[in-house]
């Protein structure tokens, strides 16, 4: 993930053996504005958007903790937009590492691991 993914279509990108995400990206089933508008009838105020963002757990750190993302790719100081070349190198390095690992696995093992991965996603609060 780079930038923002905030829809069901964005979640379709997660149907993969590995999901990588830049450190300052966000990824969710809905935008924070949409969530706040539905839950609290206020998608415009910064307070409600912040509340929705916290509830949705959309940050790279949140998503790695909930096993939605497999690796968070660090960004250069100031963000990916500040140094495109450094960002591209970091993304390339991460992609090559994961592709190299995955291409060594047999298809039946890939399928089994993918299934196990999806079963681990999420959190339960009681």
Regions found by a protein language model. Give the residues of each.
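Intrinsically disordered, low-complexity segments enriched in small/flexible residues
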Residues: 85-126
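Conserved catalytic cores of soluble enzyme domains
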Residues: 1-92, 96, 104
């Amino acid at each position: 993930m780079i930038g923002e993914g905030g829809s069901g279509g964005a979640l379709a990108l997660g149907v993969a053996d590995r999901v990588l995400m830049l450190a300052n990206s966000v990824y969710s089933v809905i935008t924070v504005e949409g969530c706040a508008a539905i839950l609290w009838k206020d998608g415009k105020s910064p307070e409600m958007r912040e509340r929705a963002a916290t509830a949705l757990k959309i940050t790279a750190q949140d998503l790695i903790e909930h096993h939605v993302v497999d690796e968070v790719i660090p960004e250069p100081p100031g963000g990916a937009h500040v140094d495109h070349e450094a960002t591209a190198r970091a993304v390339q390095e991460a992609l090559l590492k994961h592709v190299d690992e995955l291409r060594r696995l047999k298809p039946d093992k890939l399928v089994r691991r993918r299934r196990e991965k999806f079963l681990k996603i999420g959190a339960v609060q009681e």
